[in-house]
Amino acid sequence: MGLLQDYVIIVTGSASGIGYATSSTALREGAHVFGVDVSPLPADLCDHPNFQSFQGDLTEDSTAQAVVTACTQAFGNRIDGLLNVAGVLDNFASVDAVTDQIWNKCLAVNLTAPVKLMRAVIPIMRTQKRGSIVNVSSKAGISGGAAGVAYTASKHGLIGVTKNVAWRFKEENIRCNAVCPGGVLTNIGSDIDRESFDMEAFETMKPVQLAHMPDQSKGPRITPEEVAQVMIFLVSGLSSKVNGAVIPVDDAWSTI
Protein backbone atom coordinates (compact mmCIF):
# COMPACT_ATOMS: atom_id res chain seq x y z
CA MET A 1 0.00 0.00 0.00
CA GLY A 2 1.37 3.40 -0.99
CA LEU A 3 1.90 6.44 1.21
CA LEU A 4 -1.05 8.20 -0.44
CA GLN A 5 -3.33 5.22 -0.98
CA ASP A 6 -6.76 6.51 -2.09
CA TYR A 7 -5.88 10.15 -1.31
CA VAL A 8 -7.42 12.75 -3.61
CA ILE A 9 -4.92 15.50 -4.40
CA ILE A 10 -4.74 18.48 -6.71
CA VAL A 11 -1.36 19.24 -8.29
CA THR A 12 -0.79 22.41 -10.29
CA GLY A 13 1.93 22.68 -12.92
CA SER A 14 1.49 18.99 -13.74
CA ALA A 15 2.61 19.23 -17.35
CA SER A 16 6.32 19.43 -16.59
CA GLY A 17 9.09 19.77 -14.04
CA ILE A 18 8.31 19.45 -10.34
CA GLY A 19 4.56 19.29 -10.96
CA TYR A 20 4.95 16.39 -13.37
CA ALA A 21 7.33 14.57 -11.04
CA THR A 22 4.98 15.11 -8.10
CA SER A 23 1.96 13.88 -10.05
CA SER A 24 3.82 10.77 -11.23
CA THR A 25 5.13 9.99 -7.76
CA ALA A 26 1.72 10.49 -6.16
CA LEU A 27 0.14 8.08 -8.64
CA ARG A 28 2.77 5.47 -7.79
CA GLU A 29 1.94 6.00 -4.11
CA GLY A 30 -1.73 5.20 -4.74
CA ALA A 31 -3.28 8.66 -4.98
CA HIS A 32 -6.03 9.92 -7.23
CA VAL A 33 -4.42 12.94 -8.87
CA PHE A 34 -6.18 15.93 -10.40
CA GLY A 35 -3.53 17.64 -12.51
CA VAL A 36 -3.79 21.27 -13.55
CA ASP A 37 -1.74 23.20 -16.08
CA VAL A 38 -2.06 25.95 -18.66
CA SER A 39 -0.32 23.60 -21.12
CA PRO A 40 -1.56 20.22 -22.38
CA LEU A 41 -1.00 17.39 -19.91
CA PRO A 42 1.37 14.54 -20.89
CA ALA A 43 -0.16 11.36 -22.30
CA ASP A 44 1.49 9.08 -19.74
CA LEU A 45 -0.35 10.91 -16.96
CA CYS A 46 -3.64 11.19 -18.82
CA ASP A 47 -3.61 7.46 -19.60
CA HIS A 48 -3.40 6.54 -15.92
CA PRO A 49 -6.78 5.41 -14.53
CA ASN A 50 -6.36 7.48 -11.36
CA PHE A 51 -5.49 10.72 -13.13
CA GLN A 52 -7.85 13.46 -14.26
CA SER A 53 -6.77 16.76 -15.77
CA PHE A 54 -7.81 20.37 -16.13
CA GLN A 55 -6.19 22.68 -18.66
CA GLY A 56 -6.64 26.33 -17.79
CA ASP A 57 -5.06 29.60 -16.73
CA LEU A 58 -4.93 29.87 -12.95
CA THR A 59 -4.61 33.65 -13.12
CA GLU A 60 -8.15 33.97 -14.45
CA ASP A 61 -10.71 34.84 -11.78
CA SER A 62 -12.93 31.79 -12.05
CA THR A 63 -10.32 29.08 -12.62
CA ALA A 64 -9.50 28.16 -9.01
CA GLN A 65 -13.09 27.40 -8.11
CA ALA A 66 -13.59 25.63 -11.43
CA VAL A 67 -10.61 23.37 -10.65
CA VAL A 68 -11.99 22.40 -7.25
CA THR A 69 -15.47 21.80 -8.65
CA ALA A 70 -14.10 19.63 -11.46
CA CYS A 71 -11.96 17.66 -8.99
CA THR A 72 -14.95 16.85 -6.79
CA GLN A 73 -16.98 15.86 -9.83
CA ALA A 74 -14.20 13.49 -10.88
CA PHE A 75 -13.30 11.96 -7.52
CA GLY A 76 -16.14 12.79 -5.13
CA ASN A 77 -16.56 15.52 -2.53
CA ARG A 78 -13.17 14.96 -0.91
CA ILE A 79 -9.80 16.65 -1.31
CA ASP A 80 -6.97 15.41 0.89
CA GLY A 81 -4.18 17.52 -0.54
CA LEU A 82 -3.44 20.62 -2.57
CA LEU A 83 0.05 20.96 -4.02
CA ASN A 84 0.67 24.41 -5.46
CA VAL A 85 3.58 23.85 -7.82
CA ALA A 86 2.90 26.06 -10.86
CA GLY A 87 5.16 29.09 -11.07
CA VAL A 88 6.96 31.54 -13.33
CA LEU A 89 10.38 33.14 -13.08
CA ASP A 90 11.20 36.80 -13.61
CA ASN A 91 14.01 38.37 -15.65
CA PHE A 92 16.19 39.09 -12.60
CA ALA A 93 15.18 42.76 -12.76
CA SER A 94 15.86 44.82 -9.64
CA VAL A 95 13.34 47.29 -8.24
CA ASP A 96 14.59 50.15 -10.43
CA ALA A 97 14.12 48.11 -13.61
CA VAL A 98 11.16 45.80 -13.06
CA THR A 99 8.21 46.39 -15.38
CA ASP A 100 4.57 46.29 -14.38
CA GLN A 101 4.11 43.32 -16.70
CA ILE A 102 6.80 41.20 -15.02
CA TRP A 103 5.70 42.25 -11.52
CA ASN A 104 2.03 41.54 -12.14
CA LYS A 105 2.67 38.19 -13.80
CA CYS A 106 4.92 36.89 -11.01
CA LEU A 107 2.49 37.94 -8.31
CA ALA A 108 -0.51 36.56 -10.20
CA VAL A 109 0.97 33.12 -10.88
CA ASN A 110 3.23 32.60 -7.86
CA LEU A 111 1.11 34.14 -5.10
CA THR A 112 -2.45 35.05 -6.04
CA ALA A 113 -3.27 31.78 -7.83
CA PRO A 114 -2.15 29.59 -4.88
CA VAL A 115 -4.15 31.79 -2.50
CA LYS A 116 -7.28 31.41 -4.62
CA LEU A 117 -6.86 27.65 -4.76
CA MET A 118 -6.38 27.48 -1.00
CA ARG A 119 -9.49 29.60 -0.54
CA ALA A 120 -11.42 27.17 -2.74
CA VAL A 121 -10.27 23.93 -1.04
CA ILE A 122 -10.35 25.04 2.59
CA PRO A 123 -14.16 24.74 2.94
CA ILE A 124 -13.98 21.10 1.83
CA MET A 125 -11.05 20.39 4.15
CA ARG A 126 -12.87 22.02 7.06
CA THR A 127 -15.94 19.87 6.46
CA GLN A 128 -13.89 16.67 6.37
CA LYS A 129 -11.69 17.91 9.26
CA ARG A 130 -8.43 17.13 7.56
CA GLY A 131 -6.23 18.25 4.71
CA SER A 132 -2.67 19.06 3.71
CA ILE A 133 -1.48 21.94 1.55
CA VAL A 134 2.05 22.14 0.18
CA ASN A 135 3.25 25.31 -1.51
CA VAL A 136 6.37 25.50 -3.65
CA SER A 137 8.34 28.58 -2.68
CA SER A 138 12.04 28.91 -3.51
CA LYS A 139 15.49 29.80 -2.25
CA ALA A 140 14.35 33.26 -3.37
CA GLY A 141 11.58 33.03 -0.76
CA ILE A 142 14.14 33.05 2.05
CA SER A 143 16.88 35.13 0.44
CA GLY A 144 17.29 38.46 -1.28
CA GLY A 145 20.06 37.44 -3.64
CA ALA A 146 18.70 34.56 -5.70
CA ALA A 147 16.32 36.16 -8.23
CA GLY A 148 14.75 39.42 -9.33
CA VAL A 149 12.55 41.56 -7.12
CA ALA A 150 9.24 40.29 -8.54
CA TYR A 151 10.00 36.60 -8.10
CA THR A 152 11.58 37.24 -4.71
CA ALA A 153 8.54 39.16 -3.48
CA SER A 154 6.10 36.53 -4.74
CA LYS A 155 7.94 33.66 -3.07
CA HIS A 156 8.44 35.53 0.21
CA GLY A 157 4.73 36.29 0.14
CA LEU A 158 3.84 32.64 -0.38
CA ILE A 159 5.80 31.68 2.73
CA GLY A 160 3.86 34.28 4.72
CA VAL A 161 0.59 32.85 3.46
CA THR A 162 1.76 29.32 4.29
CA LYS A 163 2.47 30.23 7.91
CA ASN A 164 -0.80 32.14 8.28
CA VAL A 165 -2.88 29.26 6.92
CA ALA A 166 -1.02 26.74 9.10
CA TRP A 167 -1.73 28.66 12.29
CA ARG A 168 -5.30 29.61 11.42
CA PHE A 169 -6.52 26.08 10.66
CA LYS A 170 -4.29 23.91 12.87
CA GLU A 171 -7.15 23.09 15.26
CA GLU A 172 -9.13 21.69 12.32
CA ASN A 173 -6.40 19.24 11.32
CA ILE A 174 -5.50 21.22 8.21
CA ARG A 175 -1.79 21.57 7.62
CA CYS A 176 0.09 23.96 5.34
CA ASN A 177 3.80 23.71 4.58
CA ALA A 178 6.22 25.05 2.00
CA VAL A 179 9.25 23.67 0.21
CA CYS A 180 12.07 25.83 -1.11
CA PRO A 181 13.86 24.10 -3.97
CA GLY A 182 17.32 25.10 -5.07
CA GLY A 183 18.35 25.02 -8.71
CA VAL A 184 16.15 22.48 -10.49
CA LEU A 185 16.18 21.62 -14.17
CA THR A 186 12.67 22.62 -15.30
CA ASN A 187 11.18 24.84 -18.00
CA ILE A 188 10.19 27.59 -15.54
CA GLY A 189 12.47 30.08 -17.25
CA SER A 190 11.48 29.23 -20.81
CA ASP A 191 9.17 32.22 -21.22
CA ILE A 192 11.58 34.86 -19.88
CA ASP A 193 12.02 37.83 -22.19
CA ARG A 194 15.76 37.56 -22.75
CA GLU A 195 15.91 41.03 -24.27
CA SER A 196 14.80 42.56 -20.96
CA PHE A 197 17.04 40.35 -18.79
CA ASP A 198 18.69 42.51 -16.11
CA MET A 199 22.30 41.43 -16.51
CA GLU A 200 23.57 44.16 -14.18
CA ALA A 201 21.40 42.81 -11.36
CA PHE A 202 22.25 39.21 -12.20
CA GLU A 203 25.98 39.93 -11.92
CA THR A 204 25.49 40.98 -8.29
CA MET A 205 23.82 37.62 -7.60
CA LYS A 206 26.38 35.48 -9.39
CA PRO A 207 28.34 34.66 -6.21
CA VAL A 208 25.13 33.32 -4.65
CA GLN A 209 24.37 31.22 -7.72
CA LEU A 210 27.93 29.90 -7.95
CA ALA A 211 27.89 28.87 -4.29
CA HIS A 212 25.07 26.48 -5.19
CA MET A 213 26.32 25.41 -8.61
CA PRO A 214 30.09 26.02 -8.77
CA ASP A 215 30.37 23.96 -11.95
CA GLN A 216 27.73 25.40 -14.27
CA SER A 217 28.50 22.78 -16.91
CA LYS A 218 27.03 20.07 -14.67
CA GLY A 219 23.69 21.86 -14.49
CA PRO A 220 21.31 22.09 -11.51
CA ARG A 221 22.07 20.12 -8.36
CA ILE A 222 18.47 19.16 -7.56
CA THR A 223 16.12 16.99 -9.62
CA PRO A 224 12.34 17.45 -9.83
CA GLU A 225 11.95 13.94 -8.39
CA GLU A 226 13.94 14.88 -5.29
CA VAL A 227 11.62 17.81 -4.63
CA ALA A 228 8.58 15.63 -5.33
CA GLN A 229 9.62 13.12 -2.67
CA VAL A 230 9.61 15.83 -0.01
CA MET A 231 6.20 17.06 -1.15
CA ILE A 232 4.77 13.54 -1.00
CA PHE A 233 6.08 13.23 2.56
CA LEU A 234 4.45 16.52 3.52
CA VAL A 235 1.04 15.60 2.14
CA SER A 236 1.16 12.12 3.69
CA GLY A 237 0.33 10.99 7.20
CA LEU A 238 4.03 10.56 7.97
CA SER A 239 4.23 14.33 8.51
CA SER A 240 1.07 14.64 10.62
CA LYS A 241 2.65 17.13 13.06
CA VAL A 242 4.66 19.09 10.50
CA ASN A 243 2.71 22.31 10.05
CA GLY A 244 3.86 25.77 9.05
CA ALA A 245 7.29 24.46 8.10
CA VAL A 246 9.48 25.92 5.38
CA ILE A 247 11.73 23.13 4.13
CA PRO A 248 14.69 23.80 1.82
CA VAL A 249 15.44 21.15 -0.79
CA ASP A 250 18.72 22.62 -1.98
CA ASP A 251 21.72 20.64 -0.71
CA ALA A 252 22.52 23.26 1.99
CA TRP A 253 22.26 26.34 -0.27
CA SER A 254 19.86 27.88 2.24
CA THR A 255 22.56 27.91 4.90
CA ILE A 256 24.25 30.91 3.30
UniProtKB/Swiss-Prot annotation:
Disulfide feature: none
Binding sites annotated in the UniProt record for NADP(+): 11, 57, 119, 151, 155, 183, 187
Reaction(s) this enzyme catalyzes, per UniProt: 3-hydroxypentacecilide A + A = chrodrimanin C + AH2; chrodrimanin F + A = chrodrimanin H + AH2
Associated pathway: Secondary metabolite biosynthesis; terpenoid biosynthesis
Keywords for the protein's UniProt record, in alphabetical order: NADP, Oxidoreductase
Active-site residues per Swiss-Prot or TrEMBL entry: 137, 151, 155
GO molecular function, one term: oxidoreductase activity
Domain of life: Eukaryota
A biological process from GO: terpenoid biosynthetic process
Assigned protein family: Belongs to the short-chain dehydrogenases/reductases (SDR) family.
PANTHER family per record: DEHYDROGENASES, SHORT CHAIN, ESTRADIOL 17-BETA-DEHYDROGENASE 8-RELATED
Main function: Short-chain dehydrogenase/reductase; part of the gene cluster that mediates the biosynthesis of chrodrimanin B, a meroterpenoid that acts as a potent blocker of insect GABA-gated chloride channels. The first step of the pathway is the biosynthesis of 6-hydroxymellein by the polyketide synthase cdmE. The prenyltransferase cdmH acts as a 6-hydroxymellein 5-farnesyltransferase and produces the hydrophobic metabolite verruculide C. The FAD-dependent monooxygenase cdmI further converts verruculide C into verruculide B.
Name of protein: Short-chain dehydrogenase/reductase cdmF
Organism: Talaromyces verruculosus
Gene giving rise to this polypeptide: cdmF
